[in-house]
Amino acid sequence: MPFFYKTPSGADLLNTQTPGAYKQADLLVTSKIIPEGGSSSQVINLAVQEITIMNDAASGYSYFVGELPTEVHRHIIETYVRLSPTLTDTLTYEFRSPDVVSKIYYNKGLVWDIANLKQNQWMPIIVVR
């Protein structure tokens, strides 16, 4: 799932040329999950090993792909996106079934809804800071 970060004026916060942009080395995505066959007392943290910032040719904005562990064998509780050493955001979820996410909330604001998906296309998460 692609994550885009912009300022209210539209500046790209993942572009190194933007003042105050987030640094690739600081980015970390970690999800709290319950493993297959586990219970709520067996929560583990699963981190994306490497975040790569890429450029979206269509929009001209930079983004990174945050892999969300929503496979059948895991139940995702919430995800933390560290943007800098002093700034970490939280994603929470609603599920249509145990393994299908229907809504994603970013710091409690709805940012993704399966009802708005176009066929065969992932909807990006766009965060304005």
Regions found by a protein language model. Name each.
Residues M1-I33:
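N-terminal export/targeting and maturation segments
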